[in-house]
């Protein structure tokens, strides 16, 4: 968040390069064709060379960018905190198109990370909707409501989609706060199935399961076919779990106290645990060569071999 960007060797942890951008960074890092894409708290979007960190492109947007831009072909897709989805062409100062969602009075601080599927840019918004926008025209291809606001207070009616949307084939898996986890047809937005859940970290897929960490600490494996729940683990209640990440035959999550937990993808039993430090790790973990790469909230970048976990 302090404007430092570094490239670290996944093999041995050596630093390959480091740059200071002198601006606060607020989103993750996107990658496409040897370039990195980042968003800033000052309402900026940047493209850096993945080889040396040199800034290749810099544009201004209407609000801070809290998630990594998505890039596909000739389009850079940016989601902003004020409910907009923007389509930039490389090198352009202004977006070619803008989609603006309805922003509720009260929302969580965050946004989903947009993805590109075929000709559509797909993102979740604070009003509980998933929207697909044609990247070439900026027209809405479809909308699907995942979270339905309920209750008398603005807090009760928060239904943000802030977590990751997972694509597998033609299916999309998405979860909302105080709403549902659902499977959608990526071509039409048609809802294939849904289950009640409240999540701010989104979904992941493995072993025929759709994994979701509920805000109450329940980690669930829903059958990808929509035929119910394969298993649920309630041992990590209210520990603010990170997005579940499949790796090998396990699913991994980090809690608010800095503990990494490994669960069996088959039955959800906890099979390993390690202390990664004094902080949580809200950034998505990366499964790499049968292990995990974790970026902790305190700025540490860690690589774990699963065989070393107790």
Residue ranges and their predicted role:
Residues 9-12, 49-52, 89-93, 135-138, ...:
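Short loop/turn segments that connect beta-strands within beta-propeller blades
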Residues 6, 46, 86, 131, ...:
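WD40 beta-propeller blade core
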Residues 209-224, 228-262:
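Loop/turn-rich, solvent-exposed surfaces of beta-rich toroidal or solenoidal domains
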Residues 1, 40-41, 80-81, 125-126, ...:
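Structural signature of WD-repeat beta-propellers
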Residues 214, 236, 255-258, 263-310:
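Hydrophilic extracytoplasmic domains
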Residues 16-32, 55-72, 95-118, 143-167, ...:
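Extracytoplasmic beta-rich repeat domains
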Residues 14, 43-44, 54, 58, ...:
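Tandem repeat domain/solenoid detector
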């Amino acid at each position: 968040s302090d404007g430092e960007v570094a490239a670290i060797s996944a093999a041995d942890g050596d630093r390959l390069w480091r740059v200071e951008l002198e601006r606060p960074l607020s989103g993750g890092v996107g990658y496409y064709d040897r370039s990195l894409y980042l968003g800033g708290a000052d309402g900026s979007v940047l493209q850096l060379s993945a080889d040396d960190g040199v800034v290749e492109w810099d544009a201004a947007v209407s609000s801070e960018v809290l998630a990594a831009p998505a890039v596909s072909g000739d389009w850079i897709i940016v989601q902003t905190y004020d409910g907009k989805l923007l389509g930039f062409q490389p090198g352009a100062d202004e977006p070619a198109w803008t989609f603006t969602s309805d922003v509720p009075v009260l929302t969580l601080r965050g946004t989903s990370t947009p993805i590109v599927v075929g000709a559509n840019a797909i993102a979740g918004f604070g009003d509980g909707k998933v929207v697909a926008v044609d990247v070439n025209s900026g027209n809405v291809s479809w909308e699907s409501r995942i979270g339905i606001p309920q209750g008398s207070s603005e807090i009760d009616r928060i239904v943000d989609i802030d977590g990751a949307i997972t694509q597998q084939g033609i299916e999309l898996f998405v979860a909302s706060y105080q709403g549902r986890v659902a499977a959608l047809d990526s071509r039409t937005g048609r809802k294939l199935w849904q289950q009640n859940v409240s999540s701010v970290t989104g979904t992941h897929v493995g072993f025929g399961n759709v994994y979701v960490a509920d805000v109450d600490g329940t980690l669930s494996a829903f059958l990808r076919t929509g035929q119910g729940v394969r298993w649920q683990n309630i041992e990590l209640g209210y520990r603010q779990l990170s997005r579940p990440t499949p790796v090998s035959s396990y699913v991994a999550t980090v809690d608010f106290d800095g503990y990494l937990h490994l669960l069996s993808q088959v039955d959800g039993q906890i099979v390993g645990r390690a202390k990664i430090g004094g902080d949580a790790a809200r950034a998505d973990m990366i499964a790499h060569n049968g292990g995990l790469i974790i970026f902790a909230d305190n700025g540490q970048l860690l690589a774990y071999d699963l065989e070393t976990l107790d």
